[in-house]
């Protein structure tokens, strides 16, 4: 859309725009078209190049042309799902945004956070560069604005309007996306992903400036980063060779079951494998380059070395540490265990489906092939029942006079998606 305005001055309508927006609506719902048009509309207004009527017609034609394929899908889905489907669509897409009642759906929308959540999420998402920019603020020479506050605001506004198109569009996109997702009650870190590339443009320019004009700060940052990465590399190496047992070491300082399970999972992830060795070799290479550049005086190369090191650290965290944690705490292993031990099929597995009162076992449902049935509504004669360890006693108490439950298996670990152990039982109507 930016190229459409820059190259064609809004003449015609490139086929790629409605096709991409069609795909956005099908994957993310109405926000897939509302948010891009909101950003583009504000950008066109700030260009002060087109009339309000021209901007309105541009957004209208773009929006209408992007609804044909999604409307066909929504109509067919509504024919199959009826009002239940419509209620979920309205709740998920408009109930979240407008803080509407959730009475027409059987679960809480959740993810309710304060307005500050988005800013904390962005700061965490850009780590460790956020730390570099934060500490750079202490060396800034703050000057009192000249003239009245109104004059200062006008000068700031004129400065923004005088930005080149790429920077102006990036600024508009960053502010509009963050502002847009401050409005709904539901807030999640993934909602802000569209803003990251645009914010990164300004962050990269700030980091380049610091590298050229405040090289000491950049080198201190690189040194601290290299030291922390070195500790992580040595820890992984000691665990891999069996020199250090991370779980045994941690047990001397904490007795928390979930903490010890997590540390044990990380230790298991450090066991030798092709992917683990490749990541550690890359991390070692990045460390050697960083140590070498720390003793050189070419600042830009030091920055490049830091970028490569941060990339390898992310590989280390996501490719080894988090992979181990997710594999150990995933519902997949327990699903495989109970499916192999008991004759579970698409007709005999039941759960409590009132998600306002009971935990959603969505992970197990996925790994068992989406075979769950609603125990409350179907009231079956016999079958298998799944619930987490917090809900299971409530179910036993509620149906004590109607069903008998025989506990068969409990997950050995706390499953990440439900934050509790899950119990499998066999039931029969009395």
Q: Where is each model-derived feature located?
A:
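Specific aromatic-rich, kink-prone transmembrane helix
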Residues: 1-6, 41, 199-202
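Transmembrane-lumen/periplasm boundary regions of multi-pass, lipid-linked membrane glycan transferases
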Residues: 4, 19-20, 27, 32-185, ...
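Juxtamembrane helix-boundary/capping and inter-helix hinge elements in multi-pass membrane proteins
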Residues: 8, 82, 212-213
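Membrane-embedded architecture of ER/inner-membrane glycosylation machinery
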Residues: 142, 146-430
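Membrane-embedded alpha-helical bundles of multi-pass enzymes
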Residues: 14, 18, 34-37, 191-198
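Membrane-interface transmembrane helices that cradle and orient dolichyl/undecaprenyl
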Residues: 1-14, 207
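Hydrophobic/aromatic ligand-binding patch that stacks against planar heteroaromatic rings
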Residues: 22-23, 364
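A generic structural signal for nonpolar/aromatic side chains embedded in well-ordered alpha-helices
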Residues: 1, 88-89, 97, 207, ...
């Amino acid at each position: 859309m930016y190229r459409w305005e820059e190259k064609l001055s809004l003449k015609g309508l490139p086929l790629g725009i409605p096709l991409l927006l069609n795909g956005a609506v099908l994957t993310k719902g109405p926000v897939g078209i509302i948010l891009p048009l909101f950003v583009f509309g504000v950008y066109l207004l700030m260009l002060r190049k087109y009339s309000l009527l021209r901007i309105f017609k541009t957004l209208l034609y773009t929006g209408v042309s992007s609804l044909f394929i999604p409307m066909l899908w929504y109509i067919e889905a509504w024919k199959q799902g009826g009002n239940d489907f419509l209620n979920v669509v309205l709740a998920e897409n408009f109930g979240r945004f407008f803080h509407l009642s959730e009475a027409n759906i059987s679960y809480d929308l959740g993810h309710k956070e304060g307005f500050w959540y988005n800013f904390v999420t962005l700061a965490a998402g850009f780590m460790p560069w956020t730390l570099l920019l934060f500490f750079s603020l202490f060396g800034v020479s703050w000057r009192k604005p000249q003239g009245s506050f109104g004059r200062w605001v006008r000068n700031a506004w004129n400065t923004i309007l005088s930005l080149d198109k790429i920077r102006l569009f990036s600024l508009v996109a960053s502010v509009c996306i963050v502002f847009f997702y401050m409005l709904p009650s539901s807030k999640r870190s993934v909602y802000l992903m569209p803003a990251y590339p645009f914010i990164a443009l300004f962050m990269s320019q700030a980091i380049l400036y610091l590298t050229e004009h405040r090289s000491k700060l950049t080198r201190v940052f690189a040194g601290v980063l290299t030291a922390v990465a070195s500790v992580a590399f040595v820890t992984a190496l000691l665990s891999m060779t069996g020199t250090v047992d991370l779980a045994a070491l941690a047990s001397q300082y904490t007795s928390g079951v979930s903490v010890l399970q997590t540390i044990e999972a990380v230790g298991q992830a450090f066991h030798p494998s092709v992917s683990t060795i490749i990541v550690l070799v890359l991390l070692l290479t990045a460390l050697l380059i960083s140590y070498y550049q720390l003793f050189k005086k070419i600042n830009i190369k030091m920055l490049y070395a830091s970028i490569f090191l941060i990339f390898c650290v992310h590989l280390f965290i996501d490719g080894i540490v988090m992979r181990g944690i997710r594999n150990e705490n995933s519902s997949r292993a327990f699903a495989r265990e109970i499916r192999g031990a008991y004759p579970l099929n698409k007709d005999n597995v039941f759960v409590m489906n009132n998600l306002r009162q009971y935990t959603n076992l969505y992970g197990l449902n996925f790994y068992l092939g989406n075979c769950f049935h609603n125990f409350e509504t179907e009231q079956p004669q016999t079958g298998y029942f799944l619930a987490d360890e917090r809900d299971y006693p409530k179910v036993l108490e509620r149906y004590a006079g109607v069903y008998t439950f025989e506990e068969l298996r409990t997950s050995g670990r706390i499953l990440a998606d439900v934050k509790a152990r899950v119990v499998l039982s066999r039931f029969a109507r009395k």
